[in-house]
Every structure is written in C-alpha cells, then in structure tokens.
C-alpha cells in the first residue's frame, strides 16, 4: 500500500522561481509514488492581516499554479483548507491536548510576535491546527523545509500524547526534508535566498513574469568583474546561482555549461539563460491562464474538497469518540 504524504501551502501572492525549484517541483514529483494531499492553508493565512479580495485571489492563483506545474488531480488531492470543516474542528481538539508553554516556545511565534503589542491568538495556536491538518489524513510523511521542522516535532508529540491519553488512532508522521532542490538565491544579492518579499523586484523571478521582464531581470543580475562562467559558490556566488538555474531548467550539467561558455563573456551567457527561463516557464504560464478563470479549476477544487472531506470526517469521528464528544451513535 502507498504511504500518505501531506503538504500544506500558504496562499501568499506570487510564487517565485526559488519556490518552484526548491519545493513545488519536488512535491509534484512525489505524487507518483505516494497517496498525496496538497492543501491550500487559507485558515493559517489569516493569522496575519489579510485583504479579503487579495486572499481569495491568492488562493485561486496558487491552485492554478500547482496544476500548471504538473499536479495531476487524478493522482493527488488538491483542496482548500477552509472547505474541509474537519480541520478547524480537529484543530480545536488538538489545542486541548497542547500546552501553552510548548506553543510559546515555537520559534515562528517568537519571531512574528516580537515587538508587537497586539498579537492574535491564532498565531500562538497555529501549530495545533497544523497538527490537525496532518493527522486527519493518516499521514506517514510530511515534506517540509528546515523552518517547519520544529512544528512537525510538535505534531508528533501531540499525536503521541493523544494516542496515550485517549485512544491509539493517529499515525505518527515522519519528517521528509526534500533532497535539496537547489537553493535559489536573490539575483540582486546572491548571498540571500530569493524571496518575493524583497523590496527590489529585480531580485526575484516569479512564475508569471513576462518574457521581457524575465530578460531584464536576468540581464541585470549581479555577477562579478571576472567575466569567467565558472561555478564557485564561495568566490562567484552570483554566477554560480545563474548556473544552477540554467542547469535545472535547461536539463544540463554545470560542467557542460562551463565548457560551453569557456572564453565567452557574461552577456552571451545571460542572454541564453533568459531564453532557457522563458521557454521553461511558457508552458506553465499557458496552462495557468487556461485554468485561472475556468470551470475546470472549480471542478478540480470541488472534487478535491469532496475527497478530503470523506477522509478527514472519518478521522474526526474517531477523535470525537476517543474524547467522548457528542452522542454515541449506532
């Protein structure tokens, strides 16, 4: 039997090339070997201030992008968290298993609440909801970045505590740190990770950037004064970052690229790289624009919610029975 994998994704605006290469691309590959659930976690998103219309737009955009990069709704379940009420219900039950002290120790809570006088309680109780998201599906593996590892440890602790205190119903999930899908750095400062929150828009590439924008961004990317196309992370971080992007999107090795551009300057290298990026993103963009306003996208999300509800409700019933909630049904 296939193992189950669960991935929660925040609907937070545009998706960068770094997100795509570092995570999305790999998550999509996992669907072939696992029983996969991809959840757009809009209830987690509201732990920080959101504009209502913007949030709705971001949810739809993310769903369309996931499908555009290759998520197959026949193989994986793609759904929106708030369309499966069991998440919020199970989240409350997990809050009643969690201790305030362990929630206050979460690094993300400390970071986001630092210096803020008014902190919403949802920021503190975010991890029990995340635990519920994962545990409702009998998840075996959770592909997460290093930044979420602490939350996943807490999920494991809460599941074990619940199993011990009430009934042994939860599978204890394992962390699956994806094999490094290359860490893509800022085009403007190659010592920093590429991020859409960078105030300089030339520092990052989004999956929906137009060809002219892409060309401009790549041509203005920081390199060095040497003029030699060579991979050397330590001394040539800018060129090394561009070589990494080229090698992944152009399906070629870094050694082949070094040989190809030997004796040639950065101008030609950047021009060719821009072409490779444009060609790699074109099919993703075409599929995205086909989907974004379509009934097909709604149908896929409806079916995903239906499947997720079926699975999640079964586990929710087990949780309610274990805790003694509601009435005993025959």
Swiss-Prot record:
Its EC number is 6.1.1.2. L-tryptophan binds at residue 133. A motif ('HIGH' region) lies at residues 11-19. It catalyses: tRNA(Trp) + L-tryptophan + ATP = L-tryptophyl-tRNA(Trp) + AMP + diphosphate + H(+). Changing residue 92 to F/A/Q: Loss of activity. The keyword Aminoacyl-tRNA synthetase applies. It is found in: Cytoplasm. Pfam families: tRNA-synt_1b. GO terms for cellular component: cytosol. Gene3D superfamilies: HUPs, Tyrosyl-Transfer RNA Synthetase. GO terms for biological process: tryptophanyl-tRNA aminoacylation. GO terms for molecular function: ATP binding; tryptophan-tRNA ligase activity. The keyword Ligase applies. A motif ('KMSKS' region) lies at residues 193-197. Keywords: Aminoacyl-tRNA synthetase, ATP-binding, Cytoplasm, Ligase, Nucleotide-binding, Protein biosynthesis. ATP binds at residues 10-12, 18-19, 145-147, 184, 193-197. Catalyzes the attachment of tryptophan to tRNA(Trp). HAMAP family: Trp_tRNA_synth_B. Belongs to the class-I aminoacyl-tRNA synthetase family. Homodimer. PANTHER family: TRYPTOPHAN--TRNA LIGASE, MITOCHONDRIAL. This is Tryptophan--tRNA ligase. It comes from Bacillus subtilis (strain 168). The gene is trpS.
């Amino acid at each position: 039997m296939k193992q189950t994998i669960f991935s929660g994704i925040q609907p937070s605006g545009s998706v960068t090339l770094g997100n795509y290469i570092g995570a999305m691309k790999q998550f999509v590959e996992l669907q072939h070997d696992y029983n996969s659930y991809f959840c757009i976690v809009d209830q987690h998103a509201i732990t920080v201030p959101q504009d209502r219309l913007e949030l709705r737009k971001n949810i739809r955009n993310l769903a369309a992008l996931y499908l555009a990069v290759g998520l197959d709704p026949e193989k994986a379940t793609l759904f929106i968290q708030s369309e499966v009420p069991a998440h919020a219900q199970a989240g409350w039950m997990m809050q009643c298993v969690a201790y305030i002290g362990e929630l206050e120790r979460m690094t993300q809570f400390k970071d986001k609440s630092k210096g803020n006088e008014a902190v919403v309680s949802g920021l503190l109780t975010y991890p029990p909801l995340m635990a519920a998201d994962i545990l409702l599906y009998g998840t075996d593996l959770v592909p997460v970045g290093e930044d979420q590892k602490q939350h996943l440890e807490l999920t494991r602790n809460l599941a074990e505590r619940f199993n011990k205190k009430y009934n042994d119903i939860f599978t204890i999930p394992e962390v699956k740190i994806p094999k490094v899908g290359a860490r893509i750095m800022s085009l403007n400062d190659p010592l920093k990770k590429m991020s859409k929150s960078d105030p300089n828009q030339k520092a990052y590439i989004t999956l929906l950037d137009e060809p002219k924008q892409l060309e401009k961004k790549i041509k203005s990317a920081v390199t060095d004064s040497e003029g030699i196309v060579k991979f050397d992370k330590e001394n040539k971080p800018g060129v090394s970052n561009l070589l990494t992007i080229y090698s992944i999107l152009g399906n070629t090795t870094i050694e082949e690229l070094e040989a190809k551009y030997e004796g040639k300057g950065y101008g030609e290298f950047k021009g060719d790289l821009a072409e490779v990026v444009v060609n790699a993103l074109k099919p993703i963009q075409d599929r995205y624009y086909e989907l974004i306003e379509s009934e097909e996208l709604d149908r896929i999300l409806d079916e995903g919610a239906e499947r997720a509800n079926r699975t999640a409700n079964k586990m929710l019933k087990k949780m309610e029975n274990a805790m003694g909630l509601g009435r005993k049904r025959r």
